[in-house]
Amino acid sequence: MELIDFILHVDDHLLEFITNYGVWIYAILFLIIFVETGLVVMPFLPGDSLLFAAGALAASTGAMNPWTLGALLFIAAVLGDTLNYHIGRYIGPRVFEIESRFINKQHLINTQKFFEKHGGKTIIFARFIPFARTFAPFVAGAGKMDYKFFLSYNLIGAFCWIGSFITLGYIFGNVPVVKDNFTHLIFGIIIISILPGIIGFTRAKLKKKINH
């Protein structure tokens, strides 16, 4: 319940962090983005809504420089995916063969299928899809994708993801109608983010049922 409250009221919690920790807010946000993208067992952290809220608070409070914020979180996202890639390269194949309560194998399989269809561009697309952005670099590592290719997609994906959400938050986060309905907006961002995954899962289920 606490996690759900944090996600839906992420702006209030970030404002509290800014008040209590000041400049350390950069380190807190860096750590959250790094952990979400870097550890395959932590796909539930609120990346999209967090970035939007951070951009909005950078505009409204002046406590964070948007350029510094964007640069640091870009680095966090790149390093996180890089760590996840190497974890996948080291233990990935074994994860597909065993049952684990820490890693949802179905998410891994779905991401692998997405890779088969879209190739390296999956690293870019997955940045905007919760769960997929955590599993994509892991699957890339497990599939032994060439690191140079992975890094190029990683850099592009991180730039697009971090840049777009922080910019949108900075521009629109303090528009009165947005500010007054921030919780609803965050909920909307979450729904839109997970919608592609839901559609893909539903299509796969229907296709499987038809084939049988």
Language-model features and meaning:
Residues 1-30, 56-149, 174-189, 196-212:
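Membrane-interfacial helix-loop-helix
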Residues 30-52, 193:
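Transmembrane alpha-helix interface/packing and boundary motifs in multi-pass membrane proteins
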Residues 131-135, 155, 159-162:
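Hydrophobic alpha-helical transmembrane bundles that constitute the permease/transmembrane domains
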